[in-house]
A protein has these predicted regions:
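Alpha/beta enzyme core
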Residues: 2-269
Length: 269
């Protein structure tokens, strides 16, 4: 039987839909002891690279404001800007679950603003969930988590401590994160990003909490690991001069660009 172009396109779309992971698939991975691989990215090309590598979760982080846009203050980064990057990643992600962060400025604007933003992220980016960062402000911002849940859009709260501080591992730290991980889980969160705690705390929380618990500093004791693409690959200008053996995509690009510039200047290209 010969299929028409339209029929072939429909079959490809159907096959892609069957292969697409869901939030429930991530939960099943935890239940079976399989680890969740997550990557933070903001653009089409990095999304395609991660997908080819087999990533399970793509997170469009509000860190794009600093990494790509050169902003020094999160208050400069708007929801409209976040939606632009969220659309780019969701448009080409065919397998991974996609998260789009709630911008910090929106989180600080109150539950009503968060509710409206969640609706826009869901409808305009077609992402699977949104991450609400309530680190160090769990008491003040917990209602933001409830606001997203009230819209019916899955929420993925970030709990814990700032990454520039030493790792937190005291009994007090454990009690703090355990309290709030239980709170967001009981409220209906589908996943938790636990930030900057000791491996012992990651282990204890991941074992006690039913939903997946992953983080950017976690080891195999958690349910998975998040890597920021541009740190992982060294796609940062400050990695050009490093000689510590870590990956440096920037150095590779720099050498190619430098050679091209030299040839143009000398008229030998």
């Amino acid at each position: 039987m010969k299929w028409s172009a339209l029929e072939c396109a429909s079959i490809r779309a159907w096959e892609e839909e069957l292969s697409r992971l869901t939030i429930n698939d991530l939960q099943l991975m935890k239940n079976k002891g399989e680890k969740i691989a997550a990557g933070v990215c903001y653009d089409v090309q990095m999304t395609k690279i991660w997908e080819r590598a087999g990533v399970d979760l793509l997170s469009v982080g509000d860190s794009v404001s600093r990494t790509f846009l050169g902003m020094e203050d999160d208050s400069e980064f708007s929801l409209d800007a976040m939606l632009l990057f969220g659309k780019a990643v969701a448009r080409v992600a065919h397998r991974a679950v996609v998260n789009v962060d709630m911008p910090t400025v929106t989180c600080n604007a109150g539950p009503k603003a968060v509710e409206e933003a969640a609706k826009r992220i869901k409808s305009e980016t077609l992402a699977d969930m949104t991450k609400v960062d309530i680190r160090t402000q769990e008491e003040e911002l917990f209602d933001d988590v409830l606001a997203v849940i009230g819209t019916g859009f899955p929420v993925y709260p970030q709990i814990g401590f700032d990454v520039w501080e030493p790792s937190h591992g005291s009994t007090k730290d454990f009690d703090h994160v355990m309290k709030w991980c239980n709170a967001v889980q009981d409220a209906g969160a589908v996943m938790i990003d636990l930030t900057n705690v000791s491996h012992e705390i990651y282990s204890a929380v991941a074992n006690a909490i039913k939903v997946p618990v992953i983080g950017g500093q976690s080891g195999p004791e958690a349910d998975g690991r998040i890597y920021v693409s541009y740190l992982l690959t060294g796609y940062r200008s400050d990695s050009i001069d490093k000689n510590d053996g870590t990956p440096s995509a920037a150095k590779y690009i720099y050498e190619i660009a430098s050679d091209a510039v030299s040839k143009i200047h000398s008229g030998t290209w």
